[in-house]
Amino acid sequence: MNKVVSTEDPMAALLPLRQQIDQLDSQLVELLAKRAAVTAEVGRVKQQYALPLYVPEREQALIKARRQQAEEAGVSADLIEDVLRRVMRESYQTQEAGFVCCRTSGDKVVVVGGAGALGKRFVSLFQRSGYQVEVLEQDNWHQAKDMVQGAALVLIAVPIAVTQLVIAQLPELDSDTVLADLTSTKTGPLSAMLAKHSSAVVGLHPMFGPDISNIAKQVVVVSHGRDAEKYQWLIQQFKVWGAVLTEKSAQQHDELMQLIQAMRHFSSLVYGAHLAEEQADLQQ
């Protein structure tokens, strides 16, 4: 049976429906604003008790519950999960204004290379966590001896090509200072740090770039060096920031990174070979 096309004004029929949609969208905005206020309060509580920004079990349980609710309500569960994940990413932003200090507030952290892109990211994180942060660069290296004195942490955040050279040139560090690095290879830098400093040493590799908005859910590889009990506060600080920590020996880390790099180069080679075979015009 053919449907009869209405001769009524379509805009007159659509208008009340669109008004209902506008009202519902407005309510959504109000609900999101209320949720943001609650998550900001959650952030303050987490800061008070030194709790991690990201708790995977809580996030997974929340998504599972809302997916089930969506299915019961006849709404796409995938849609609800997509919306929730975007909302949760925003909530991490609202919780990141300040963090608890996992050592003593005001303790000194020296970031060698802190004016660089990744170094700046960690300077900001430590400052927002209540640490006194100083940046050591080539142009103020003459102050290195005074700067590292009394530091809780000396963090190496320089280009990989000069990492071991910079470590070797560090002045003597206090016995309770933690020496750590952020280099993307671990065997060489970790060996250099162990040779330079007789106390606590740990290798770190943040698996992200400096352009991220926050480090919640970002992976950081930890390669233990020496006196792990002395840098547990640093490990806890990364957890408070929301990072996901995974432990690998320096050798394991570098072997895996070589495999990853090989796959990246292989992918680029395959793409290039395919473009050449197709005689693609790269100008277009």
Region annotations inferred by a language model:
Residues 118:
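Hydrophobic/small residue at the entry helix of a nucleotide-binding pocket
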Residues 217-284:
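Internal alpha-helical scaffold of NAD(P)-dependent oxidoreductase catalytic cores
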Residues 145-148, 156-193:
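Rossmann-fold NAD(P) dinucleotide-binding segment
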Residues 182-212:
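Rossmann-fold NAD(P)-binding glycine/threonine-rich loop
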Residues 151:
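An anion/phosphate-binding loop that grips the pyrophosphate of nucleotide cofactors and donors
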Residues 2-110, 115, 124-132:
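N-terminal hydrophobic or amphipathic helices and topogenic motifs
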Residues 111-112, 156, 222:
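Hydrophobic Val/Ile/Leu positions in short beta-strands of Rossmann-like dinucleotide-binding domains
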Residues 133-146:
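Adenosine-cofactor binding site in Rossmann-like domains, unifying the SAM/SAH pocket
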